[in-house]
Swiss-Prot record:
Residues 103-112, 135-147, 349-377 have a biased composition (Polar residues). It comes from Rattus norvegicus. This is Uncharacterized protein SPEM2. Its main location: membrane. The chain crosses the membrane at residues 26-46. Residues 313-324, 378-389, 467-478 have a biased composition (Basic and acidic residues). Keywords: Membrane, Transmembrane, Transmembrane helix. It is found in: Membrane. InterPro entries: SPEM1_N.
Amino acid sequence: MENQLWQSTLGCCSQYQESPQDAENILFLLLGLIILVNISINVTTVIWHGLQNAIDKMFSRMHQKTAEVQVTECPPKEPQPANVQDVHIHCVLDPVQVKMAQPTQCSSSSTHYFRKHSNDRRSRRRYCYPRGSLQIRQSNQQQSCHSRQQRLRNNRQFSHGYPPFRKQRQSHKASQTRPMPFFDLEDRDSLLEDDQSCPHPKQPRRSRGGLYKPVRLASNAGLWGRQGGILASLPLPSLYLSPEMRRLPKRVEAKSELRLQGFGPHYSQSRICGNVEAEQWASSPPPPRRLLPNPSWVTVGYSPFPSGGHIPYDARDQWRRGTEGCEPPPAFVSRNLRSDAQGYRDHSSSQAHRQNFPSYTHSQPNHSPPQSVGYSSRESHEVRRRAPDWSEAFPSRHPLTTSTSLTALGEASYQRAPTASSGLVIPHSSQRLAEGQISDPTPPATTFVPLSRNPGGNANYQVYDSLELKRQVQENRGRASSLPPPSTSASRPSLHRSRTGKLN
Protein backbone atom coordinates (compact mmCIF):
# COMPACT_ATOMS: atom_id res chain seq x y z
CA MET A 1 0.00 0.00 0.00
CA GLU A 2 2.80 2.32 0.86
CA ASN A 3 4.45 1.69 -2.46
CA GLN A 4 1.33 2.56 -4.26
CA LEU A 5 0.99 5.83 -2.36
CA TRP A 6 4.60 6.72 -3.06
CA GLN A 7 4.25 6.10 -6.67
CA SER A 8 1.15 8.27 -6.80
CA THR A 9 2.88 11.16 -5.05
CA LEU A 10 5.83 10.89 -7.42
CA GLY A 11 3.47 10.91 -10.37
CA CYS A 12 1.79 14.09 -9.15
CA CYS A 13 5.12 15.86 -8.69
CA SER A 14 6.19 14.89 -12.14
CA GLN A 15 2.97 16.33 -13.46
CA TYR A 16 3.53 19.65 -11.65
CA GLN A 17 7.08 19.78 -13.09
CA GLU A 18 5.95 19.18 -16.68
CA SER A 19 3.30 21.95 -16.63
CA PRO A 20 5.68 24.94 -16.24
CA GLN A 21 7.84 23.62 -19.08
CA ASP A 22 4.84 23.51 -21.32
CA ALA A 23 4.04 27.15 -20.46
CA GLU A 24 7.58 28.20 -21.28
CA ASN A 25 7.39 26.38 -24.55
CA ILE A 26 4.14 28.08 -25.40
CA LEU A 27 5.65 31.49 -24.66
CA PHE A 28 8.65 30.71 -26.83
CA LEU A 29 6.36 29.60 -29.57
CA LEU A 30 4.39 32.83 -29.38
CA LEU A 31 7.54 34.93 -29.48
CA GLY A 32 8.78 32.98 -32.47
CA LEU A 33 5.49 33.44 -34.22
CA ILE A 34 5.59 37.20 -33.58
CA ILE A 35 9.11 37.44 -34.91
CA LEU A 36 8.22 35.40 -37.96
CA VAL A 37 5.20 37.60 -38.68
CA ASN A 38 7.32 40.73 -38.40
CA ILE A 39 9.95 39.32 -40.66
CA SER A 40 7.35 38.28 -43.18
CA ILE A 41 5.78 41.74 -43.12
CA ASN A 42 9.14 43.35 -43.72
CA VAL A 43 9.91 40.96 -46.52
CA THR A 44 6.57 41.58 -48.16
CA THR A 45 7.05 45.37 -47.96
CA VAL A 46 10.48 45.08 -49.51
CA ILE A 47 9.17 42.84 -52.25
CA TRP A 48 6.25 45.22 -52.94
CA HIS A 49 8.55 48.24 -53.24
CA GLY A 50 10.72 46.31 -55.62
CA LEU A 51 7.73 45.32 -57.69
CA GLN A 52 6.53 48.91 -57.75
CA ASN A 53 9.89 50.15 -58.97
CA ALA A 54 10.01 47.47 -61.61
CA ILE A 55 6.48 48.25 -62.78
CA ASP A 56 7.24 51.99 -62.94
CA LYS A 57 10.36 51.32 -64.96
CA MET A 58 8.41 49.11 -67.32
CA PHE A 59 5.71 51.74 -67.85
CA SER A 60 8.30 54.48 -68.43
CA ARG A 61 10.10 52.33 -70.94
CA MET A 62 6.84 51.53 -72.70
CA HIS A 63 5.96 55.26 -72.94
CA GLN A 64 9.39 56.04 -74.31
CA LYS A 65 9.05 53.32 -76.90
CA THR A 66 5.61 54.51 -77.98
CA ALA A 67 6.86 58.11 -78.26
CA GLU A 68 9.79 56.98 -80.36
CA VAL A 69 7.47 55.00 -82.59
CA GLN A 70 5.19 58.02 -83.08
CA VAL A 71 8.14 60.29 -83.88
CA THR A 72 9.50 57.85 -86.41
CA GLU A 73 6.09 57.41 -88.08
CA CYS A 74 5.12 61.15 -88.32
CA PRO A 75 7.79 62.63 -90.73
CA PRO A 76 6.76 60.66 -93.83
CA LYS A 77 3.11 61.62 -93.32
CA GLU A 78 3.48 65.45 -93.05
CA PRO A 79 5.70 67.37 -95.54
CA GLN A 80 4.79 70.70 -93.90
CA PRO A 81 8.22 71.72 -92.54
CA ALA A 82 9.57 72.00 -96.07
CA ASN A 83 6.76 74.37 -97.12
CA VAL A 84 7.22 76.48 -94.02
CA GLN A 85 10.90 76.72 -94.79
CA ASP A 86 10.10 77.85 -98.34
CA VAL A 87 7.79 80.57 -97.05
CA HIS A 88 10.52 81.76 -94.76
CA ILE A 89 12.94 81.94 -97.69
CA HIS A 90 10.42 83.98 -99.66
CA CYS A 91 10.01 86.43 -96.83
CA VAL A 92 13.76 86.89 -96.64
CA LEU A 93 13.96 87.66 -100.36
CA ASP A 94 11.19 90.29 -100.18
CA PRO A 95 13.39 93.27 -99.11
CA VAL A 96 15.72 92.63 -102.06
CA GLN A 97 12.80 93.00 -104.47
CA VAL A 98 11.53 96.10 -102.71
CA LYS A 99 14.87 97.86 -102.83
CA MET A 100 15.61 97.06 -106.45
CA ALA A 101 12.19 97.84 -107.93
CA GLN A 102 11.74 101.35 -106.52
CA PRO A 103 12.78 104.24 -108.82
CA THR A 104 14.63 106.92 -106.91
CA GLN A 105 13.06 110.07 -108.41
CA CYS A 106 10.72 111.01 -111.20
CA SER A 107 13.70 112.27 -113.22
CA SER A 108 15.35 108.84 -113.44
CA SER A 109 16.58 107.51 -116.75
CA SER A 110 13.99 104.73 -116.94
CA THR A 111 11.07 107.11 -116.34
CA HIS A 112 12.49 109.64 -118.78
CA TYR A 113 12.88 106.94 -121.41
CA PHE A 114 9.36 105.70 -120.79
CA ARG A 115 7.84 109.18 -121.08
CA LYS A 116 9.86 109.96 -124.20
CA HIS A 117 8.84 106.67 -125.79
CA SER A 118 5.16 107.24 -125.02
CA ASN A 119 5.36 110.81 -126.37
CA ASP A 120 6.95 109.55 -129.60
CA ARG A 121 4.24 106.95 -130.09
CA ARG A 122 1.55 109.54 -129.36
CA SER A 123 3.04 111.95 -131.92
CA ARG A 124 3.23 109.19 -134.58
CA ARG A 125 -0.41 108.21 -134.07
CA ARG A 126 -1.79 111.71 -133.83
CA TYR A 127 -3.36 111.55 -137.26
CA CYS A 128 -5.43 108.49 -136.27
CA TYR A 129 -7.54 110.36 -133.71
CA PRO A 130 -10.63 112.46 -134.51
CA ARG A 131 -10.48 116.19 -134.59
CA GLY A 132 -11.88 116.72 -131.10
CA SER A 133 -9.46 114.28 -129.50
CA LEU A 134 -6.60 115.80 -131.53
CA GLN A 135 -7.29 119.19 -130.00
CA ILE A 136 -7.50 117.62 -126.59
CA ARG A 137 -4.15 115.89 -127.06
CA GLN A 138 -2.53 119.09 -128.32
CA SER A 139 -3.75 120.87 -125.22
CA ASN A 140 -2.38 117.98 -123.18
CA GLN A 141 1.06 118.41 -124.71
CA GLN A 142 0.94 122.12 -123.99
CA GLN A 143 -0.11 121.50 -120.42
CA SER A 144 2.63 118.92 -119.89
CA CYS A 145 5.21 121.70 -120.24
CA HIS A 146 4.27 123.15 -116.86
CA SER A 147 6.55 122.79 -113.87
CA ARG A 148 6.54 119.80 -111.54
CA GLN A 149 5.20 121.97 -108.74
CA GLN A 150 2.09 122.81 -110.76
CA ARG A 151 1.48 119.12 -111.43
CA LEU A 152 1.89 118.29 -107.77
CA ARG A 153 -0.55 121.03 -106.82
CA ASN A 154 -3.09 119.72 -109.31
CA ASN A 155 -2.58 116.21 -107.99
CA ARG A 156 -3.25 117.40 -104.48
CA GLN A 157 -6.50 118.95 -105.66
CA PHE A 158 -7.67 115.82 -107.49
CA SER A 159 -5.98 113.17 -105.35
CA HIS A 160 -9.26 111.90 -103.89
CA GLY A 161 -11.57 112.80 -106.76
CA TYR A 162 -11.82 111.87 -110.38
CA PRO A 163 -9.24 113.39 -112.75
CA PRO A 164 -10.59 115.76 -115.44
CA PHE A 165 -11.15 115.02 -119.10
CA ARG A 166 -8.39 116.94 -120.75
CA LYS A 167 -5.78 116.21 -118.13
CA GLN A 168 -6.00 112.49 -118.55
CA ARG A 169 -2.43 111.98 -119.73
CA GLN A 170 -1.07 114.46 -117.22
CA SER A 171 -2.74 112.65 -114.32
CA HIS A 172 -1.35 109.39 -115.72
CA LYS A 173 2.18 110.78 -115.64
CA ALA A 174 1.76 112.30 -112.23
CA SER A 175 0.47 109.04 -110.76
CA GLN A 176 3.26 107.10 -112.44
CA THR A 177 6.12 109.30 -111.36
CA ARG A 178 4.89 110.09 -107.86
CA PRO A 179 7.10 108.33 -105.26
CA MET A 180 5.13 105.66 -103.48
CA PRO A 181 5.39 104.40 -99.88
CA PHE A 182 6.94 101.10 -98.90
CA PHE A 183 3.77 99.01 -98.83
CA ASP A 184 2.74 99.97 -102.41
CA LEU A 185 5.80 98.57 -104.14
CA GLU A 186 4.59 95.02 -104.25
CA ASP A 187 1.36 96.18 -105.87
CA ARG A 188 3.40 97.83 -108.61
CA ASP A 189 5.19 94.54 -109.19
CA SER A 190 1.94 92.58 -109.21
CA LEU A 191 0.58 94.98 -111.84
CA LEU A 192 3.79 94.50 -113.80
CA GLU A 193 3.35 90.75 -113.70
CA ASP A 194 -0.25 91.05 -114.90
CA ASP A 195 0.96 93.36 -117.66
CA GLN A 196 3.49 90.79 -118.89
CA SER A 197 1.13 87.82 -118.55
CA CYS A 198 -1.61 89.60 -120.52
CA PRO A 199 0.22 91.96 -122.89
CA HIS A 200 -1.65 94.79 -124.56
CA PRO A 201 -1.94 94.76 -128.36
CA LYS A 202 0.29 96.87 -130.49
CA GLN A 203 -2.52 99.02 -131.85
CA PRO A 204 -4.68 100.91 -129.38
CA ARG A 205 -8.03 99.32 -128.73
CA ARG A 206 -11.19 101.19 -129.65
CA SER A 207 -13.49 101.86 -126.72
CA ARG A 208 -16.91 103.46 -126.83
CA GLY A 209 -15.49 106.92 -126.28
CA GLY A 210 -12.76 106.75 -128.90
CA LEU A 211 -9.19 105.52 -129.06
CA TYR A 212 -6.96 105.30 -126.07
CA LYS A 213 -3.53 103.91 -125.48
CA PRO A 214 -2.87 101.42 -122.65
CA VAL A 215 -0.59 102.94 -120.07
CA ARG A 216 2.26 100.93 -118.62
CA LEU A 217 3.98 101.52 -115.33
CA ALA A 218 7.41 103.07 -115.23
CA SER A 219 8.96 100.38 -113.05
CA ASN A 220 9.31 97.90 -115.91
CA ALA A 221 11.53 100.15 -118.03
CA GLY A 222 15.18 99.29 -117.74
CA LEU A 223 14.90 97.29 -114.51
CA TRP A 224 13.47 93.83 -115.08
CA GLY A 225 14.97 92.99 -118.44
CA ARG A 226 12.73 94.81 -120.95
CA GLN A 227 15.73 96.80 -122.14
CA GLY A 228 18.40 94.51 -120.72
CA GLY A 229 18.49 96.10 -117.26
CA ILE A 230 20.36 95.17 -114.13
CA LEU A 231 17.92 92.41 -113.16
CA ALA A 232 17.55 90.78 -116.58
CA SER A 233 18.77 87.40 -115.29
CA LEU A 234 16.26 87.27 -112.42
CA PRO A 235 12.57 86.35 -112.69
CA LEU A 236 9.84 88.80 -111.85
CA PRO A 237 9.90 89.93 -108.23
CA SER A 238 6.25 89.04 -107.74
CA LEU A 239 7.23 85.35 -107.92
CA TYR A 240 8.95 85.77 -104.57
CA LEU A 241 5.84 87.13 -102.88
CA SER A 242 4.03 84.97 -100.34
CA PRO A 243 0.22 84.64 -100.37
CA GLU A 244 0.03 86.82 -97.27
CA MET A 245 1.84 89.63 -99.06
CA ARG A 246 -0.43 89.32 -102.11
CA ARG A 247 -3.52 89.96 -99.98
CA LEU A 248 -2.44 93.49 -99.09
CA PRO A 249 -4.81 96.27 -100.27
CA LYS A 250 -4.22 97.90 -103.62
CA ARG A 251 -3.13 101.50 -103.89
CA VAL A 252 -5.53 104.23 -104.88
CA GLU A 253 -3.50 105.40 -107.88
CA ALA A 254 -3.80 102.04 -109.61
CA LYS A 255 -7.56 102.07 -109.26
CA SER A 256 -7.81 105.57 -110.64
CA GLU A 257 -5.69 104.60 -113.65
CA LEU A 258 -8.04 101.71 -114.39
CA ARG A 259 -10.97 104.13 -114.27
CA LEU A 260 -9.26 106.37 -116.78
CA GLN A 261 -8.65 103.51 -119.19
CA GLY A 262 -12.32 102.56 -119.08
CA PHE A 263 -13.40 105.95 -120.43
CA GLY A 264 -16.47 105.95 -122.63
CA PRO A 265 -19.92 107.58 -122.98
CA HIS A 266 -21.72 104.61 -121.40
CA TYR A 267 -19.59 104.53 -118.33
CA SER A 268 -20.74 105.94 -115.02
CA GLN A 269 -22.67 109.20 -115.39
CA SER A 270 -21.65 110.54 -112.01
CA ARG A 271 -17.98 109.88 -112.79
CA ILE A 272 -18.18 111.77 -116.10
CA CYS A 273 -20.01 114.63 -114.47
CA GLY A 274 -17.38 114.76 -111.73
CA ASN A 275 -14.69 114.94 -114.38
CA VAL A 276 -16.48 117.78 -116.22
CA GLU A 277 -17.00 119.78 -113.07
CA ALA A 278 -13.44 119.19 -111.90
CA GLU A 279 -12.19 120.34 -115.31
CA GLN A 280 -14.28 123.52 -115.16
CA TRP A 281 -13.03 124.13 -111.65
CA ALA A 282 -9.39 123.71 -112.62
CA SER A 283 -9.43 125.56 -115.96
CA SER A 284 -11.69 128.55 -115.32
CA PRO A 285 -10.59 131.51 -113.15
CA PRO A 286 -12.22 131.93 -109.73
CA PRO A 287 -15.77 133.26 -110.28
CA PRO A 288 -17.02 136.42 -108.55
CA ARG A 289 -19.80 134.58 -106.72
CA ARG A 290 -20.45 131.18 -105.18
CA LEU A 291 -23.40 128.88 -104.80
CA LEU A 292 -24.70 127.75 -101.47
CA PRO A 293 -24.42 124.01 -100.78
CA ASN A 294 -27.67 122.13 -100.53
CA PRO A 295 -27.84 119.43 -97.84
CA SER A 296 -30.35 117.42 -99.84
CA TRP A 297 -27.56 116.53 -102.32
CA VAL A 298 -25.28 114.94 -99.73
CA THR A 299 -23.11 111.97 -100.59
CA VAL A 300 -24.03 108.74 -98.80
CA GLY A 301 -21.91 108.27 -95.69
CA TYR A 302 -21.35 111.89 -94.87
CA SER A 303 -23.57 114.75 -93.72
CA PRO A 304 -24.66 117.59 -93.86
CA PHE A 305 -22.50 119.28 -96.50
CA PRO A 306 -21.58 118.31 -100.09
CA SER A 307 -18.33 116.55 -100.82
CA GLY A 308 -17.19 118.35 -103.98
CA GLY A 309 -18.12 120.65 -106.87
CA HIS A 310 -21.49 119.30 -107.95
CA ILE A 311 -23.65 121.60 -110.08
CA PRO A 312 -27.22 121.76 -108.73
CA TYR A 313 -30.03 121.15 -111.16
CA ASP A 314 -33.51 122.56 -111.44
CA ALA A 315 -36.39 120.09 -111.48
CA ARG A 316 -37.87 121.73 -114.59
CA ASP A 317 -34.52 121.53 -116.37
CA GLN A 318 -34.19 117.93 -115.25
CA TRP A 319 -37.56 117.07 -116.74
CA ARG A 320 -36.83 118.92 -120.00
CA ARG A 321 -33.39 117.32 -120.23
CA GLY A 322 -34.92 113.90 -119.67
CA THR A 323 -37.38 114.47 -122.52
CA GLU A 324 -34.60 115.57 -124.86
CA GLY A 325 -32.63 112.38 -124.26
CA CYS A 326 -29.82 113.53 -121.97
CA GLU A 327 -29.73 113.65 -118.21
CA PRO A 328 -27.35 114.98 -115.58
CA PRO A 329 -25.77 112.50 -113.17
CA PRO A 330 -28.13 110.80 -110.70
CA ALA A 331 -28.94 112.51 -107.45
CA PHE A 332 -27.14 111.46 -104.36
CA VAL A 333 -29.26 109.81 -101.70
CA SER A 334 -29.89 112.02 -98.70
CA ARG A 335 -29.70 110.81 -95.16
CA ASN A 336 -31.00 113.95 -93.54
CA LEU A 337 -33.81 112.46 -91.49
CA ARG A 338 -35.22 115.74 -90.19
CA SER A 339 -35.64 117.28 -93.64
CA ASP A 340 -37.07 113.98 -94.89
CA ALA A 341 -39.67 113.99 -92.12
CA GLN A 342 -40.54 117.60 -92.95
CA GLY A 343 -40.97 116.57 -96.59
CA TYR A 344 -43.41 113.84 -95.56
CA ARG A 345 -45.37 116.29 -93.42
CA ASP A 346 -45.68 118.71 -96.31
CA HIS A 347 -46.34 116.00 -98.86
CA SER A 348 -50.09 116.39 -98.59
CA SER A 349 -49.86 120.12 -99.27
CA SER A 350 -47.79 119.53 -102.40
CA GLN A 351 -50.44 117.49 -104.23
CA ALA A 352 -52.12 120.58 -105.71
CA HIS A 353 -48.84 121.89 -107.07
CA ARG A 354 -47.89 118.51 -108.48
CA GLN A 355 -50.90 118.58 -110.77
CA ASN A 356 -49.46 121.63 -112.57
CA PHE A 357 -46.68 119.50 -114.05
CA PRO A 358 -47.83 116.55 -116.14
CA SER A 359 -44.49 114.74 -115.84
CA TYR A 360 -44.34 114.63 -112.03
CA THR A 361 -46.86 111.92 -111.27
CA HIS A 362 -46.85 109.04 -108.85
CA SER A 363 -45.97 106.62 -111.61
CA GLN A 364 -42.67 108.43 -112.25
CA PRO A 365 -40.93 108.91 -108.89
CA ASN A 366 -37.51 108.08 -110.30
CA HIS A 367 -37.31 111.06 -112.65
CA SER A 368 -37.86 113.88 -110.17
CA PRO A 369 -34.84 114.93 -108.11
CA PRO A 370 -35.11 117.31 -105.15
CA GLN A 371 -36.26 120.68 -106.48
CA SER A 372 -35.03 123.05 -103.76
CA VAL A 373 -31.50 123.79 -104.79
CA GLY A 374 -31.10 127.40 -103.70
CA TYR A 375 -30.24 129.56 -106.72
CA SER A 376 -31.97 132.30 -108.69
CA SER A 377 -33.58 132.28 -112.13
CA ARG A 378 -30.40 133.59 -113.73
CA GLU A 379 -28.47 130.65 -112.33
CA SER A 380 -31.11 128.20 -113.47
CA HIS A 381 -30.89 129.77 -116.93
CA GLU A 382 -27.14 129.23 -116.83
CA VAL A 383 -27.63 125.59 -115.96
CA ARG A 384 -30.19 125.40 -118.77
CA ARG A 385 -27.70 126.84 -121.23
CA ARG A 386 -25.41 123.89 -120.54
CA ALA A 387 -27.97 121.46 -121.97
CA PRO A 388 -26.19 121.04 -125.37
CA ASP A 389 -22.98 120.21 -123.51
CA TRP A 390 -24.83 117.66 -121.45
CA SER A 391 -26.37 116.16 -124.58
CA GLU A 392 -22.91 115.74 -126.07
CA ALA A 393 -21.49 114.20 -122.95
CA PHE A 394 -24.40 111.84 -122.31
CA PRO A 395 -25.78 110.20 -125.48
CA SER A 396 -27.58 107.43 -123.57
CA ARG A 397 -30.29 107.73 -120.96
CA HIS A 398 -29.94 106.26 -117.49
CA PRO A 399 -32.91 106.62 -115.14
CA LEU A 400 -32.30 108.49 -111.92
CA THR A 401 -32.41 106.45 -108.73
CA THR A 402 -34.16 108.98 -106.53
CA SER A 403 -36.42 107.60 -103.81
CA THR A 404 -40.03 108.69 -103.26
CA SER A 405 -39.06 110.32 -99.98
CA LEU A 406 -36.61 112.57 -101.80
CA THR A 407 -39.33 113.51 -104.29
CA ALA A 408 -41.68 114.41 -101.49
CA LEU A 409 -38.90 116.34 -99.81
CA GLY A 410 -38.16 118.38 -102.93
CA GLU A 411 -41.79 119.20 -103.59
CA ALA A 412 -42.48 120.06 -99.95
CA SER A 413 -39.51 122.40 -99.84
CA TYR A 414 -40.74 123.82 -103.16
CA GLN A 415 -44.05 124.81 -101.52
CA ARG A 416 -42.59 126.04 -98.23
CA ALA A 417 -43.27 129.67 -97.33
CA PRO A 418 -40.31 132.07 -96.97
CA THR A 419 -38.90 132.60 -93.49
CA ALA A 420 -37.76 135.87 -91.99
CA SER A 421 -34.10 134.98 -92.40
CA SER A 422 -34.27 134.25 -96.14
CA GLY A 423 -33.87 137.43 -98.17
CA LEU A 424 -33.57 135.86 -101.63
CA VAL A 425 -36.84 135.75 -103.60
CA ILE A 426 -36.92 132.81 -105.99
CA PRO A 427 -39.53 132.75 -108.81
CA HIS A 428 -41.86 129.91 -109.58
CA SER A 429 -40.57 127.08 -111.76
CA SER A 430 -43.30 127.54 -114.36
CA GLN A 431 -42.45 131.24 -114.76
CA ARG A 432 -38.73 130.81 -114.48
CA LEU A 433 -38.45 129.52 -118.01
CA ALA A 434 -39.92 132.68 -119.54
CA GLU A 435 -37.84 134.95 -117.31
CA GLY A 436 -34.70 132.99 -118.16
CA GLN A 437 -35.41 133.49 -121.86
CA ILE A 438 -35.96 137.23 -121.36
CA SER A 439 -32.90 137.66 -119.16
CA ASP A 440 -29.34 138.25 -120.28
CA PRO A 441 -28.42 135.63 -122.90
CA THR A 442 -24.74 135.51 -121.86
CA PRO A 443 -24.54 135.55 -118.05
CA PRO A 444 -21.20 134.76 -116.40
CA ALA A 445 -20.63 131.06 -115.80
CA THR A 446 -21.07 130.05 -112.18
CA THR A 447 -18.76 127.36 -110.95
CA PHE A 448 -18.91 125.69 -107.60
CA VAL A 449 -15.71 126.46 -105.64
CA PRO A 450 -15.25 124.54 -102.38
CA LEU A 451 -13.44 126.00 -99.43
CA SER A 452 -9.69 125.83 -99.17
CA ARG A 453 -9.97 125.08 -95.47
CA ASN A 454 -9.94 121.45 -94.42
CA PRO A 455 -10.39 121.22 -90.63
CA GLY A 456 -10.50 117.42 -90.42
CA GLY A 457 -7.17 116.86 -92.15
CA ASN A 458 -8.72 114.37 -94.55
CA ALA A 459 -8.79 115.47 -98.19
CA ASN A 460 -11.71 113.26 -99.19
CA TYR A 461 -14.28 116.03 -98.71
CA GLN A 462 -14.57 119.78 -98.15
CA VAL A 463 -16.09 121.03 -94.91
CA TYR A 464 -18.09 124.26 -94.66
CA ASP A 465 -17.94 126.09 -91.37
CA SER A 466 -20.52 128.50 -90.01
CA LEU A 467 -18.54 131.66 -90.82
CA GLU A 468 -18.17 130.77 -94.50
CA LEU A 469 -21.84 129.88 -94.78
CA LYS A 470 -22.81 133.16 -93.15
CA ARG A 471 -20.59 135.09 -95.55
CA GLN A 472 -22.05 133.30 -98.58
CA VAL A 473 -25.60 133.97 -97.37
CA GLN A 474 -24.76 137.67 -97.07
CA GLU A 475 -23.26 137.70 -100.58
CA ASN A 476 -26.34 136.04 -102.02
CA ARG A 477 -28.53 138.57 -100.26
CA GLY A 478 -26.52 141.39 -101.82
CA ARG A 479 -26.90 139.83 -105.27
CA ALA A 480 -30.61 139.35 -104.67
CA SER A 481 -31.02 143.01 -103.77
CA SER A 482 -29.10 144.04 -106.91
CA LEU A 483 -31.20 141.82 -109.22
CA PRO A 484 -34.53 143.22 -110.55
CA PRO A 485 -37.45 141.78 -108.57
CA PRO A 486 -39.74 139.41 -110.49
CA SER A 487 -43.17 140.73 -111.47
CA THR A 488 -45.48 137.94 -110.27
CA SER A 489 -43.81 134.93 -108.72
CA ALA A 490 -44.42 132.73 -105.74
CA SER A 491 -41.39 133.09 -103.49
CA ARG A 492 -39.90 130.00 -102.00
CA PRO A 493 -36.75 129.71 -99.88
CA SER A 494 -33.93 127.28 -100.32
CA LEU A 495 -33.94 124.32 -98.02
CA HIS A 496 -30.39 124.96 -97.01
CA ARG A 497 -30.92 128.71 -96.57
CA SER A 498 -34.00 128.22 -94.40
CA ARG A 499 -31.98 125.91 -92.21
CA THR A 500 -28.83 127.97 -91.90
CA GLY A 501 -30.63 131.32 -91.67
CA LYS A 502 -30.21 131.21 -87.91
CA LEU A 503 -26.52 131.92 -88.35
CA ASN A 504 -27.36 135.49 -89.37
